[in-house]
């Protein structure tokens, strides 16, 4: 009887390496696949693709599996990076890792794996898949400190049915122990951080390569001019560092935070104090939705939601907001809910799916002009 073939997405990191070893130990016919999703465009100071590939080959040799490299740079540029630039140009703060998972790692990669005769794919993500009553559920990892279901919430039934997450029930500390015990050459390699195609290079420098600077006024909620910004695309809601007002003695003396953007007038609004009302929201509208089960929760469903990675689930109530949109009403005010980021819903351990945040209502008089999503929020009330 032939072994079931599983293709493992291998990045050169510890997690995907241990994933491949675990599946080999369980008797699968394991093939490693290294994805190159970005063409290096500098001297290698920030990009680690070459070293990552060397690590993948070394691990594959040690555990005794075949490995190949595939270039998805063109697909990544068309499906992920182009959207990344569009969102930043519109003044929002996108999360390309969410789109990369849906469009590249679990679409382009999945299709390629199937062409290699795989029955399933596996990655080193910290999450779980459970089949129940003929449906597939996306669950949080047992190690909640490493849970990555937030980034995977756009996966659908077809994708989950062919996906394995072997690390979903293993603490990260145990993964490191396994790597050391079996002698993986990358056992002590640091976890990757930041956006995959930016690496460790300064984010503003990278963005400036693709988006022009367009300076404009920086104002307080009452209209007082306190400085000049270099371009709305280079700032995000709740940002504290890099505003250029650290030494300002105006106002309360508290730190300054980015609070709003007015695209029409090219104005950046800033406030003082972490808990300023302009930074707190009890309601949001999200669009571009995706539901793991293929359909949204029931109207008025009480659930938990994350508006950023590693945030504790916030109690809220779900409502439809017209078209392919939904609104969330939170029990407690949420800090710096950022347009462009994902609002992801949970029913306990189960990730239901989510959407892209379009608008977060602070309910404060004199707020900067609201975007087009504001009427949808009013409609949902």
Swiss-Prot record:
Its EC number is 2.8.1.13. InterPro entries: MnmA-like, MnmA-like_C, MnmA-like_central, MnmA-like_central_sf, Rossmann-like_a/b/a_fold. GO terms for biological process: tRNA wobble position uridine thiolation. It catalyses: S-sulfanyl-L-cysteinyl-[protein] + uridine(34) in tRNA + AH2 + ATP = 2-thiouridine(34) in tRNA + L-cysteinyl-[protein] + A + AMP + diphosphate + H(+). Disulfide bonds join 100-196. One of its GO terms (molecular function) is tRNA binding. It is found in: Cytoplasm. The keyword Disulfide bond applies. GO terms for cellular component: cytoplasm. It comes from the Bacteria. The keyword Transmembrane does not apply. Belongs to the MnmA/TRMU family. This is tRNA-specific 2-thiouridylase MnmA. The lineage of its organism: Bacteria, Pseudomonadati, Pseudomonadota, Betaproteobacteria, Burkholderiales.
